[in-house]
Amino acid sequence: MRRQPPRPRNSPPQSHSSPSSSSSEFEFNISISPRKASSSLCPADELFYKGQLLPLQLSPRLSLVRTLGSSTSSSDYTSSSSSSVATSAARDSTESNSSTDSTASFPLLHPPPLDCCDSSRPSSVTDDEDFFFKPPKNKSSSGGFSLSRFSSVFKKDPKTNLHHHSSSSSTATTAAAPSSVKRMSSTAKEVIRKYMKKVKPLYEKLSPKQSSNIKTESSSSLKDSGNNIRGTTTVTTVTAAPTVVSSGGGLSISFSGNLMKYTKRGRCAASCPSSMRSSPNHSGVLTRGGFPVHQGSCSSSSSNNNSVSSSMEELQSAIQGAIAHCKNSMLQKNLVSSLEI
């Protein structure tokens, strides 16, 4: 018998050329846990609400949205939705528990805390939540801020300004709002009082000046009118006095000036002197030369005096009527000015 050569100890065993044995060498096992699969998938109701995308971070807003949607439906639907809310809450808790392992290896996937999570996308859900759950703001804060601005113009104390700004910023709460409004109203009253204290003395100084100006104007007008009336009388007395009779019994001279007026034909027209306005008896009768005739003059001038006397009387009456009219008008003006004062 032939002896077979010994086999090496480290030689691998002979493999059969079967497809099963070759495929078994490249097999590998994949284990999938159901919790991790559920964490990667979310239903569409949790991502969209009324056609708008909700914030991607998990928050209690989902339960609020579902409660709002369930309030509009019937009671049967509310019961089913409450059960779904409970299941979704349990699912959220399981997802949060399962996500702790992944966040340890990937810190960037860790969601920020709920206090600072705000989606950059505008959402109607956030507006609804603000409308339902936020207290209404007091509108008096804007008025208080304007009053603090107005008072800061007159006040220079930095402490008071800081106090007003802090009070205006703290009016978000309803309890602090009425107290701040009262403070602003009190500061506005103080500002108005200070303004009136500064303005009153100026007004009191100006008002007597105006009244004194009016009084001086009225008194000056009265004095001017009195001087006009007195001037006529004084002129007449002065002009009546210097009528002097010459030693030879000739003509008397009056200081009324040259009243001669030469016309183209060479004739002269005489007018009455100023003394005739008040005392026509002392003025005498005018001649053609403008000189009055004394009583002791010659008889040849008597015929001329008779012819001129009628015209002079008419002039005197007309002048006296004009003087009376002027006096009446001046008196009326004085009365009107006194009534206006």
UniProtKB/Swiss-Prot annotation:
One of its GO terms (molecular function) is kinase inhibitor activity. The keyword Protease does not apply. Residues 208-230 have a biased composition (Polar residues). Keywords: Brassinosteroid signaling pathway, Cell membrane, Lipid metabolism, Membrane. GO terms for biological process: brassinosteroid mediated signaling pathway; lipid metabolic process; response to brassinosteroid. Residues 12-29, 67-108, 167-180, 297-310 have a biased composition (Low complexity). Residues 1-29, 67-122, 158-185, 206-230, 288-310 are annotated as: Disordered. It is found in: Cell membrane. Its main location: membrane. GO terms for cellular component: cytosol; plasma membrane; plastid. PANTHER family: MEMBRANE-ASSOCIATED KINASE REGULATOR 1-RELATED (PTHR33312:SF8), MEMBRANE-ASSOCIATED KINASE REGULATOR 4-RELATED (PTHR33312). May negatively regulate brassinosteroid signaling. A C-terminus-derived peptide binds BRI1 in vitro. This is Probable membrane-associated kinase regulator 1. It comes from Arabidopsis thaliana (Mouse-ear cress). The gene is MAKR1.
